[in-house]
Amino acid sequence: MNDNVLLIGASGFVGTRLLETAIADFNIKNLDKQQSHFYPEITQIGDVRDQQALDQALAGFDTVVLLAAEHRDDVSPTSLYYDVNVQGTRNVLAAMEKNGVKNIIFTSSVAVYGLNKHNPDENHPHDPFNHYGKSKWQAEEVLREWYNKAPTERSLTIIRPTVIFGERNRGNVYNLLKQIAGGKFMMVGAGTNYKSMAYVGNIVEFIKYKLKNVAAGYEVYNYVDKPDLNMNQLVAEVEQSLNKKIPSMHLPYPLGMLGGYCFDILSKITGKKYAVSSVRVKKFCATTQFDATKVHSSGFVAPYTLSQGLDRTLQYEFVHAKKDDITFVSE
């Protein structure tokens, strides 16, 4: 085990939970352009676009976990995706070489596969459809090139998570759970489409598992908590967790899309963004599943089932009193 670990970009949602679970097991420092709400004492302010800052920050470390990324849908200019996600990765690797660091864990994304693929595993061809996915794939290629220069000495682990949810997160899964829990949810379509999801408490434990088992070599993993749920099953999970009956209203898909187009037009007229759009209706009704056989046969055992992760999130967000109002925004 390599005990000295630098987390890059760990002031956000996943990084905060990773610090929480790993701080007792490793000598950890966080390098981020934002201060950490919960771990300021081990956080150094820095940016992956700043080579000098990286060169200095990596001194004395054995392993890097690279979490930093531009990931929002509305990043402008779009060149930021490539400046941070691709060139930032190059900068990190350059700093690693200067400091003799040979181990890196990189969080990529299932976005590298593109839309509407049938349960892709790690060997599925890449076909990213947006700048985020394209930049993540390019970053992976940079990492593989680095690894291939000294494969017997270097360790590269690439983790491609599906959508991650959990306590304090403000993203698409939270918005969906909030609508269901509040009784303001209307199912578009039959509700039989499946969605792959990942609970933050599990993915950070997998990263910690890989940190405890660093070895020379290259591995890539999809991360999904199985089994996948369809939308009807997700509503049932919310009902069970909150012990309340959720109104069951199904809107036919054509009507849902019509409503989405109406909001598209309204958005163009007013210049405002709305929670409903034709793209979101289409995504909501699509089956989005990814194969995670490899990660779940790697020796890692997730501490929570998907149902437990949902229950923990729902109880924290909609039942129990909160100690603070700190949240993390994602897509």
Curated annotation (Swiss-Prot):
GO cellular component, one term: plasma membrane
Annotated catalytic residues: 132 (proton acceptor)
Binding site for NAD(+): 13-14, 34-39, 47-48, 109, 132, 136
Broad class of the protein's primary localization: membrane
Pathway noted in the entry: Bacterial outer membrane biogenesis; LPS O-antigen biosynthesis
Cofactor: NAD(+)
Catalytic activity: N-acetyl-alpha-D-glucosaminyl-di-trans,octa-cis-undecaprenyl diphosphate = N-acetyl-alpha-D-galactosaminyl-di-trans,octa-cis-undecaprenyl diphosphate
Residues given in the record as substrate binding sites: 109, 132, 183-184, 199-201
Described function: Involved in biosynthesis of the repeating tetrasaccharide unit of the O-antigen. Catalyzes the reversible epimerization of the hydroxyl group at position C4 of undecaprenyl pyrophosphate-N-acetylglucosamine (UndPP-GlcNAc) to yield undecaprenyl pyrophosphate-N-acetylgalactosamine (UndPP-GalNAc).
Similarity field: Belongs to the NAD(P)-dependent epimerase/dehydratase family.
Name this protein carries in UniProt: N-acetyl-alpha-D-glucosaminyl-diphospho-ditrans,octacis-undecaprenol 4-epimerase
Organism: Escherichia coli O157:H7
